[in-house]
From Swiss-Prot:
<dbReference type="GO" id="GO:0051604">
    <property type="term" value="P:protein maturation"/>
</dbReference>
<protein>
    <recommendedName>
        <fullName>Hydrogenase maturation factor HypA</fullName>
    </recommendedName>
</protein>
<feature type="binding site">
    <location>
        <position position="76"/>
    </location>
    <ligand>
        <name>Zn(2+)</name>
    </ligand>
</feature>
<feature type="binding site">
    <location>
        <position position="2"/>
    </location>
    <ligand>
        <name>Ni(2+)</name>
    </ligand>
</feature>
<feature type="binding site">
    <location>
        <position position="92"/>
    </location>
    <ligand>
        <name>Zn(2+)</name>
    </ligand>
</feature>
<dbReference type="GO" id="GO:0016151">
    <property type="term" value="F:nickel cation binding"/>
</dbReference>
<keyword id="KW-0479">Metal-binding</keyword>
<dbReference type="GO" id="GO:0008270">
    <property type="term" value="F:zinc ion binding"/>
</dbReference>
<keyword id="KW-0862">Zinc</keyword>
<feature type="binding site">
    <location>
        <position position="89"/>
    </location>
    <ligand>
        <name>Zn(2+)</name>
    </ligand>
</feature>
<dbReference type="GO" id="GO:0036211">
    <property type="term" value="P:protein modification process"/>
</dbReference>
<dbReference type="InterPro" id="IPR000688">
    <property type="entry name" value="HypA/HybF"/>
</dbReference>
<comment type="similarity">
    <text>Belongs to the HypA/HybF family.</text>
</comment>
<dbReference type="Pfam" id="PF01155">
    <property type="entry name" value="HypA"/>
</dbReference>
<keyword id="KW-0533">Nickel</keyword>
<feature type="binding site">
    <location>
        <position position="73"/>
    </location>
    <ligand>
        <name>Zn(2+)</name>
    </ligand>
</feature>
<comment type="function">
    <text>Involved in the maturation of [NiFe] hydrogenases. Required for nickel insertion into the metal center of the hydrogenase.</text>
</comment>
């Protein structure tokens, strides 16, 4: 379950930012996650709740912004929507796709006090 290490990394980032920007508590965290990031959102929520106990983010809301998956098709030279890696191009059926969006996992915004 790599979601646990992701949650731990988020808490570490929050602690670093708290020291740098001098805030004491995190009330909410917004994450952008693409469908190609290989993250199970419900597992991440569970892990986030577990690792934030006793930290400056204890009780913080975890808001997930799901990004669409997109790829450039080398077969028909078009930008196309994809739901998972190794999907065929919905326009021409080619499997020669380069992912351009959807593999992100990043902290987008924080609500702090």
């Amino acid at each position: 379950m790599h979601e646990m290490s992701i949650a731990e990394g988020i808490v570490q980032l929050l602690e670093e930012q708290a020291a740098a920007q001098r805030f004491e508590r995190v009330k909410a965290v917004w994450l952008e996650i693409g469908p190609l990031a290989a993250v199970e959102v419900e597992s991440l929520r569970f892990c986030f709740e577990a690792v934030t106990r006793g930290s400056l983010a204890e009780g913080a809301r975890l808001e997930i912004v799901e990004l669409p998956g997109r790829a450039w098709c080398l077969g028909c030279n078009a930008s196309v929507a994809i739901r998972q890696r190794y999907d065929a191009c919905p326009q021409c059926g080619s499997y020669r796709l380069q992912v351009t969006q959807g593999d992100e996992l990043r902290v987008k915004e924080l609500e702090v006090e």
